[in-house]
């Protein structure tokens, strides 16, 4: 196999197309979310003006500052998912761009009702969005971060590796993008969709690697 692996991905924001793609998926899929603050740059500019120029109560200031400083890593009440990527091999992925609440709800409903086995890396991050929006979790899943932490790593916690980018750099190189691209304004950029698709394929490849290792050890 040649490295780095070139990922083949396709993307859509069309609900009909997304539904058709999801119906055709195999039984084991790797999934990943991209997220962003739910507030636009324009909305944040207005928040900044209010914070700098208005007399606010302590509670008003606290809430407004929390909204102003929010990013894709913030609480689900302050964020939205912008992409769902799904990989079913080490190089094939689809990316669904979630640019409205109808698409987001469709995605959440799919993830908590499908019987396909879902592979996630660092599932607590993604699952907090699923749980917050549905009150449920996927039916069948496993977490490659937890599995890596349990099976592959050094007993010394200061020497172990669980980051997907670290674990899979040998196969995909450095595919990270700037944190500034995780915004509502940047969600349509080709680089963001490529990043999202690579995340899903890297997760699937890590899942395959772990399966091979555990088979060797007869685990």
Regions found by a protein language model. Give the residues of each.
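Mixed-charge, glycine-rich, non-catalytic linkers/tails in nucleic-acid processing enzymes
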Residues: 135-144, 177, 182-219
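Non-catalytic alpha-helical coupling and interface elements of nucleotide-dependent molecular machines
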Residues: 152, 169-173, 208-212
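Conserved RNase H-like, two-metal-ion catalytic cores of nucleic-acid enzymes
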Residues: 1-166, 170
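Short N-terminal secondary-structure initiator segments
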Residues: 157, 162, 170-186
């Amino acid at each position: 196999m040649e490295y780095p692996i070139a990922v083949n991905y396709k993307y859509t924001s069309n609900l009909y197309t997304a539904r058709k793609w999801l119906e055709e998926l195999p039984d084991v899929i790797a999934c990943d979310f991209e997220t962003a603050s739910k507030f636009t740059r324009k909305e944040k500019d207005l928040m900044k003006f209010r914070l700098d120029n208005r007399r606010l109560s302590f509670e008003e200031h606290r809430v407004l500052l929390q909204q102003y400083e929010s990013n894709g890593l913030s609480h689900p009440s302050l964020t939205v998912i912008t992409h769902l990527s799904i990989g079913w091999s080490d190089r094939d992925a689809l990316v669904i761009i979630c640019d409205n609440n109808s698409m987001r709800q469709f995605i959440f409903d799919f993830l908590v009702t499908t019987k396909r086995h879902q592979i996630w890396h660092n599932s607590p991050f993604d699952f907090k969005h699923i749980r917050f929006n549905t009150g449920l979790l996927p039916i069948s899943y496993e977490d490659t971060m937890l599995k890596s932490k349990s099976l592959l790593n050094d007993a010394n916690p200061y020497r172990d590796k669980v980051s997907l980018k670290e674990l899979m750099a040998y196969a995909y190189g450095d595919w990270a993008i700037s944190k500034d691209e995780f915004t509502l304004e940047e969600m349509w950029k080709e680089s963001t969709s490529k990043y999202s698709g690579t995340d899903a394929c890297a997760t699937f490849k890590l899942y395959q690697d772990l399966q091979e290792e555990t088979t060797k050890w007869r685990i």
